[in-house]
From Swiss-Prot:
Modified residues (Phosphoserine): S303, S307, S322, S446, S450, S565, S569, S657
Composition-biased stretches (Basic and acidic residues): 268-283
Lineage: Eukaryota, Fungi, Dikarya, Ascomycota, Saccharomycotina
Subunit relationships: Forms a NOT protein complex that comprises NOT1, NOT2, NOT3, NOT4 and NOT5. Subunit of the 1.0 MDa CCR4-NOT core complex that contains CCR4, CAF1, NOT1, NOT2, NOT3, NOT4, NOT5, CAF40 and CAF130. The core complex probably is part of a less characterized 1.9 MDa CCR4-NOT complex.
Protein's organism: Saccharomyces cerevisiae (strain ATCC 204508 / S288c) (Baker's yeast)
Name this protein carries in UniProt: General negative regulator of transcription subunit 3
Gene responsible for this protein: NOT3
């Protein structure tokens, strides 16, 4: 009875799907045929969306029935589900087309007429996509069969070795499907990059169809050499990316199948065995938790005082609770305090690593390698040392060692070895309180030494101020140290740039002043004892002049004092006696040199045949020898990557995507290589340069708009720039004064006068390399560059001047001066209107 009701429900859903698909297809056909009525098209799209929603709900019902073992006929469920998914894909395509902007890059590419090769490439790509989808559908159908076999094997009555054999066979089929999908995906990607000939794919099309249609036939024989002739591994980057994607997909499929098989194996066990496995798992979890807890407990060692040893994690908390207490929590010996205060952070980290690698039970107090030093700061800014036992890594980084303290330790290690030994002998018989005070004094000296080695700051707000809480003091200290470092770097950079631009070295006037060092020391140690500061300053006065010069660091911060001492007053008059030569050309000289080089390169057609690297070398040498390019030795890193050009790229022009740039450069280079026969043959025949130039232009006129724009801005030689500009002008493109926008009028002018014109325009923007469409756009003539006849300039350079009428040239120049720029454009506009 229940089975009959379920079958009736399935039939009812099938009927609804058939009706919904019929309605959907009728709406879809009307939508595709509707091209002139946008409102009707939008209404049909909303109707399609409503029908797809209904079909999606029915598809969810079918998916639930597919996973249920009550329904035997799963093939019909799969067919109806696939028909609904096809309708969903159709609607997705309709929705994507409706969301595309009218003049986006995709729409403009669609509007262009495709050549036969592009159409063939698109057809082959669609064919490969269909084959990949068909193999995916077959993969899903086999996965359904595998799930069925797994359900049968769960029960002892239906379990058999035949099911396992079928399952393994289906998995082998799925592995072959994935391999063929990977090869087709590689071919698809290579076709998109124009690295694979569509005809090669056509040659193996029959073999691919045979595999897709007949791979499960009994007499099927697979040919694994189908894709050998396509050379799919030519692009290693694409091959690696596709292989990585399919490897992750296979791993995901294997994990899913392993999980299903493990559930099947567990279900075969008896309840008693399952309970036994659960008990063993619980015991293992408890044992692991116990081991983790034991490893986190530090081993306490013998201390020199009755007070307990403070752990690493609680050391800073104890310091915050008792600000007035001694900074050393474990009363260590003064000798150990002095030794640990001059250790570097690296040594303490090295001592920590072996202790972490050993087990907690093997850590004993007698092993000296297991002891490490934890350096921290008290609220008044003095560092202290605590001897700790090995423990696990804390959640908070162990220690708050500042970079100034670490730097001063390395300096003081060399100049205070003798004073440290005397301090050890004098303080060995003192009480613990005296020892703590001595350690405090040594740490204060360390901070003063750090201040002496730090560039002076003119901002008084960066000095350390006392605070009530330890946390706020630590934060203020960290902020001051970071600000000091940033200010020092900024000051060093400014001084370095001043040095590069000045005629005399600035280190002569930047001699260090002991008074400034004294001010830095007193500013940093406002919170420390006064007697400690005085004692350190007295020790500093007793030092020899050589040591004082070693410790003094000028505020310039870039060069050492040795360089300053090497300078002698005798060398300065020699520099003054040298004749002063101008480093840079004036603006008029620069323009004259630029025009001269431009005329020379525009008339040299053989530069088009040179590789880009040779062109760049020639241009940079010419610019450097003519003093147009700066001869200063100092250059920024980004300047080293710039290509030398006679005309720089405008400020608002950004480079396109690397793939588009590579494609444009490749097309341009192919055209340049094809000019070899034209240029060399014309020179042998001694043809006129104007005829050679016309042949060159004719060769470049086949290029697309994007390549012309790219090479107008990023080509190396002036001749290439002139060629691109000439062809763009022939196609009625007009460029703005700043060179960041180009305008192309569509149709006739709607309004014009001497100042502006109004019409429909295509605007090419160089900041993002996109074309936008503007209706009724007002174009001011003052915003455009004046029109330049590049062909006449080239010919004036190359043609012999004996046959040129000088009077006509003068008349032309007089006309250009008399007629304004707006009138010239208006005249050209009228001519264009008449031609339209």
């Amino acid at each position: 009875m229940a089975h009959r009701k379920l079958q009736q429900e399935v039939d009812r859903v099938f009927k609804k799907i058939n009706e919904g698909l019929e309605i959907f297809n009728s709406y879809y056909e009307r939508h595709e045929s509707c091209t002139n009525n946008p409102s009707q098209k939008d209404k049909l799209e909303s109707d399609l969306k409503r029908e797809v929603k209904k079909l999606q709900r029915l598809r969810e019902q079918i998916k639930s029935w597919q996973s249920s073992p009550d329904i035997k006929d799963k093939d019909s469920l799969l067919d109806y589900r696939r028909s609904v998914e096809i309708a969903m894909e159709k609607y997705k395509a309709v929705e994507k087309a409706s969301k595309e902007k009218a003049y986006s890059n995709i729409s403009l590419k669609k509007s262009e007429t495709l050549d036969p090769q592009e159409r063939e490439r698109r057809d082959i790509s669609e064919y490969l996509s269909q084959m990949i989808d068909e193999l995916e559908r077959q993969y899903d159908s086999l996965q359904v069969e595998i799930d069925k076999l797994l359900l049968l094997n769960k029960k002892k009555k239906t379990s058999s070795t035949t099911n396992d054999e079928k399952k393994e066979q289906y998995k082998r089929f799925q592995a072959r499907y994935r391999w063929h999908q990977q090869q087709m995906e590689l071919a698809l990607r290579l076709l998109a990059n124009e690295e694979l000939d569509p005809q090669d794919v056509k040659n193996v099309q029959d073999d691919i169809n045979y595999f897709v249609e007949s791979n499960q036939d009994p007499d099927f024989v697979e040919d694994e050499t189908i894709y050998d002739g396509l050379n799919l591994q030519s692009n290693e980057a694409i091959a690696h990316e596709v292989a990585q994607y399919f490897a992750s997909q296979n791993a995901e499929d294997n994990n899913t199948s392993d999980a299903n098989e493990s559930l099947q194996d567990i279900s075969k066990l008896s309840k008693k065995e399952q309970r036994k496995l659960e008990r063993e798992a619980k015991k293992a979890a408890k044992l692991a938790a116990k081991n983790a807890t034991g490893a986190a407990i530090p081993v306490a060692g013998p201390s020199s005082t009755p007070s307990p040893v403070i752990p690493v994690a609680d050391a800073s908390k104890e310091t915050e609770r008792s600000p007035s207490s001694s900074p050393i929590h474990n009363a260590t010996k003064p000798e150990e305090a002095v030794k640990t205060s001059i250790k570097s952070p690296r040594s303490s980290a090295d001592n920590l690593l072996p202790s972490l690698q050993k087990s907690p039970s093997s850590a004993t107090p007698e092993t000296p390698t297991n002891v490490h030093t934890h350096i921290h700061q008290t609220p008044n800014g003095i560092t202290g040392a605590t001897t700790l036992k090995p423990a696990t890594l804390p959640a908070k980084p162990a220690g708050e060692l500042k970079w100034a303290v670490a730097a001063s330790q390395a300096v003081e290690k060399d100049r205070k070895v003798t004073s440290a030994s005397s301090t050890i002998s004098n303080t060995s018989t003192k009480t613990p309180t005296t020892a703590a005070a001595t350690t405090t004094s040594s740490n204060a000296n360390s901070r003063i030494g750090s201040a002496l080695n730090t560039p002076k700051l003119s901002t008084s707000s960066l000095s350390l101020q006392p605070d009530n809480t330890g946390a706020s003091s630590s934060a203020a200290t960290a902020a001051a140290v970071l600000a000091a470092g940033a200010a020092a770097v900024h000051q060093n950079n400014q001084a370095f740039y001043r040095n590069m631009s000045s005629s005399h070295h600035p280190l002569v006037s930047l001699a260090t002043n002991p008074k400034s060092e004294h001010e830095v020391a007193t500013t940093v140690n406002q919170n420390g004892p006064e007697n400690t500061t005085k004692k350190v300053m007295e020790q500093k006065e007793e030092e020899s002049p050589e040591e004082r010069n070693k410790l003094q660091v000028p505020t310039f911060g870039v060069f050492d004092d040795d360089f300053e001492s090497d300078r002698d007053s005798e060398t300065e008059p020699e520099e003054e006696e040298q004749p002063s030569t101008p480093k840079y050309l004036s603006l008029e000289q620069r323009e004259a040199k630029t025009n001269e080089i431009k005329k020379e390169f525009v008339s040299d057609f053989e530069t088009l045949l040179l590789p880009s690297g040779v062109q760049e070398f020639i241009m940079s040498s010419e610019l450097y020898n003519s003093q147009i390019e700066s001869k200063i030795t100092y250059k920024r890193s980004r300047d080293m990557c710039e290509i030398s050009r006679l005309v720089e790229v405008p400020q608002g022009v950004n480079p396109p995507s690397p793939l588009d740039a590579f494609r444009s450069t490749q097309q341009w280079d192919v055209m340049r290589c094809s000019l070899r026969d034209i240029i060399i043959g014309s020179e042998r025949l001694k043809e006129d340069s104007s005829s050679i130039y016309a042949k060159i232009l004719e060769n470049f006129r086949t290029l697309e708009m994007f390549s012309l724009f790219y090479n107008y801005y990023f080509a190396i030689t002036p001749l290439e720039r002139e060629i691109a500009y000439k062809i763009l002008n022939e196609r009625d493109w007009k460029v703005s004064k700043d060179g960041t926008m180009w305008f192309l009028r569509q149709g006739e002018v709607k309004f014009f006068n001497e100042i502006c014109e109004v019409g429909d325009y295509k605007i090419f923007k160089l900041d993002d390399w996109t074309v936008i469409d503007k209706i009724n756009f007002r174009l001011d003539y003052s915003f455009l560059q004046p029109p330049v006849d590049t062909a006449s300039e080239v010919r004036d350079v190359s043609v012999d001047n004996n046959n040129v009428n000088d009077q006509s040239n003068v008349t032309l120049e007089q006309q250009k001066q008399e007629i304004s720029h707006g009138k010239q454009l208006l005249k050209q506009l009228k001519q264009g209107k008449i031609s339209v």
